[in-house]
Amino acid sequence: MLILTRRVGETLMIGDEVTVTVLGVKGNQVRIGVNAPKEVSVHREEIYQRIQAEKTQQTSY
């Protein structure tokens, strides 16, 4: 795992088309902004896991 340190307003690049920007830090929460092409899905981990579980349930019927 790559670990990076960024300050508010700083950005990191993932490939050529995805940017992640730190928008703010308040207590133990970090607000980030993600810019990605429409064909790239961006989800919080818990939402992604729910989507995958639903796909698995649909294919098992």
UniProtKB/Swiss-Prot annotation:
PANTHER family linked to this entry: CARBON STORAGE REGULATOR (PTHR34984:SF1)
GO CC entries: cytosol
Subcellular location: Cytoplasm
Oxidoreductase keyword on record: no
Name this polypeptide is given: Translational regulator CsrA
Subunit organization: Homodimer; the beta-strands of each monomer intercalate to form a hydrophobic core, while the alpha-helices form wings that extend away from the core.
Function field: A key translational regulator that binds mRNA to regulate translation initiation and/or mRNA stability. Mediates global changes in gene expression, shifting from rapid growth to stress survival by linking envelope stress, the stringent response and the catabolite repression systems. Usually binds in the 5'-UTR; binding at or near the Shine-Dalgarno sequence prevents ribosome-binding, repressing translation, binding elsewhere in the 5'-UTR can activate translation and/or stabilize the mRNA. Its function is antagonized by small RNA(s).
Keywords of this entry: Activator, Cytoplasm, Repressor, RNA-binding, Translation regulation
UniProt similarity note: Belongs to the CsrA/RsmA family.
NCBIfam families referenced in this protein's UniProt entry, alphabetically: csrA, PRK01712.1
InterPro entries: CsrA, CsrA_sf
A single GO molecular function term of this UniProt record: mRNA 5'-UTR binding
Origin: domain of life: Bacteria
Lineage, opening ranks: Bacteria, Pseudomonadati, Pseudomonadota, Gammaproteobacteria, Enterobacterales
BP terms from Gene Ontology: mRNA catabolic process; negative regulation of translational initiation; positive regulation of translational initiation; regulation of carbohydrate metabolic process
Gene: csrA
Pfam families tied to this protein: CsrA (PF02599)
